A protein has these predicted regions:
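Seventh transmembrane helix
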Residues: 242-243, 301, 307-311, 327-373
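First transmembrane helix
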Residues: 61-90
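Helix-to-loop junction signature of class
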Residues: 66-72, 110-126, 140, 147-154, ...
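Loop architecture of class A 7-transmembrane GPCRs
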Residues: 18-21, 25, 44-54, 123-140, ...
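Extracellular TM2-ECL1-early TM3 structural module of rhodopsin-like
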Residues: 58-70, 96-157, 163-172
Length: 393
């Protein structure tokens, strides 16, 4: 009753009329109150039957998810906007390799700019989708397109670094024309895969949380199964193989070079064969490898849960996919858009230098290093080197 629910210090002035009424907890929902009952009538037609009988989520979850999307979206849009502003203002940073970084920033920026406002709007207004079935299809299409482009670009960045660090001068250099070709291919690839559900192979659907839309990963017909399997192989498994292979050979090449130098130094009875310039070169190589591996590892953390839930829902036990379980991989996948600009800001000394010039109030402190003419090939081709001057366009 209300009397039992009331704290003791207010019972004395709670009117007796209210004592026997049943207490109402606005945060509690009866077990019979399902997602289908909670969904507005205009979205019930495209809410997958798998979700109909699940109990409606606690309202606090919607506010929590809305807050998460607000934080991630704001960080992603602001961070990638700064990256693009830096590249546009300082022409010296626009190397062929950095064009790939720019493409990654464009993809991440557009993804969050297009998706996070409606997610925040839905969740803070109670959860259910408020933009109709067509809006749901567009939302899912944009998420898939920009996500595929991000994956393709990260794969090409890893191959470019493999080509420079492992092959060196024997490798094919990345020219501006090649970089533009790769970027064009990445968008064609992304558009091709993201259009498939719109033309009948696979499908887009509203997620169980009802505030976002993505792939239909709970239908187990052969059309949907074949699409999910093909998309997972082409845009998750294949990139993993390429990326892991590239970084394996990068690390192997660095350690092999170190071993050869130690062996030669031992024969000559000297402590080290390295000059200061060589030491800086190897430090750059190791730093690039570490940062790249960290970037890919975080990308795997973001996209692996989504890949797993898609395979589980279409090929496994779909009953294990609850509305909350379906919400976690979707929001994790979007976190990569927020931390990509942070990783690149940390990994590139010259980016930080230009960032400091553009925003002096950020108090960015750089360690001063000796600059020599004998710069490493890796530094010249894969990072913003000490020779790049931050001169505004």
């Amino acid at each position: 009753t209300l009397y039992a629910y009331a704290p003791e210090d207010i019972r004395s002035f709670l009117h007796p009329h209210w004592h026997t009424y049943k207490a109402f907890d606005p945060w509690a929902l009866p077990d019979t109150f399902t997602l289908y009952a909670y969904a507005p009538e205009d979205i019930r037609s495209f809410l997958h039957p798998h979700w109909h009988t699940y109990k409606a989520l606690h309202p606090a979850w919607y506010y929590f998810l809305g807050l998460m999307y607000l934080i991630i979206g704001t960080c992603a849009v602001a961070g990638n906007a700064v990256v693009l502003k830096i590249f546009s203002r300082f022409p010296a940073l626009r190397s062929p390799a950095n064009l790939l970084v720019m493409n990654l920033a464009v993809s991440d920026f557009l993804l969050m700019l297009a998706l996070f406002p409606e997610c925040v709007y839905n969740f803070f207004l109670g959860g259910p989708w408020r933009f109709g079935e067509m809006g749901c299809q567009i939302h899912a299409f944009l998420g898939a397109c920009f996500g595929y482009n991000q994956i393709f670009t990260l794969t090409m960045i890893s191959y470019d670094r493999y080509n420079v660090i492992v092959k060196g001068f024997s490798g094919t250099p990345l020219t501006f024309n090649r970089a533009v070709t790769i970027i064009t291919m990445s968008w064609i690839w992304a558009l091709g895969w993201s259009i498939c559900p719109l033309v009948g192979w696979g499908a887009y659907a509203m997620d169980g949380i009802m505030g976002t839309c993505s792939y239909d990963y709970v239908s187990q017909n052969m059309n949907n199964k074949s699409h999910i399997m093909a998309a997972t192989f082409a845009n998750y498994i294949l990139p993993i193989i390429v990326i892991a292979g590239c970084y394996y050979f990068i690390v192997h090449a660095v350690f092999k070079h170190e071993e050869e130098l130690r062996a030669q130094a031992k024969k000559m009875n000297v402590a080290s064969l390295r000059s200061n310039n060589d030491q800086q070169q190897v430090s750059a190589e190791i730093r690039i490898a570490k940062v790249s591996i960290m970037n890919v590892s975080m990308w795997l953390t973001a996209w692996t849960p989504f890949a797993v839930i898609c395979i589980m829902g279409t090929w496994g036990d779909v009953s294990k996919i609850t509305p909350l379980v379906s919400a976690i991989p979707v929001i994790l996948a979007k976190t990569s858009c927020a931390y990509n600009p942070l990783i690149y800001a940390i990994s590139h000394p010259k980016y930080r230098e230009c960032l400091k010039q553009m925003f002096p109030w950020m108090c960015i402190v750089e360690e001063k290093k000796a600059v020599t003419e004998n710069q490493s090939v890796i530094s010249e081709k894969t990072e913003m080197t000490e020779t790049v001057k931050c001169e505004s366009a």
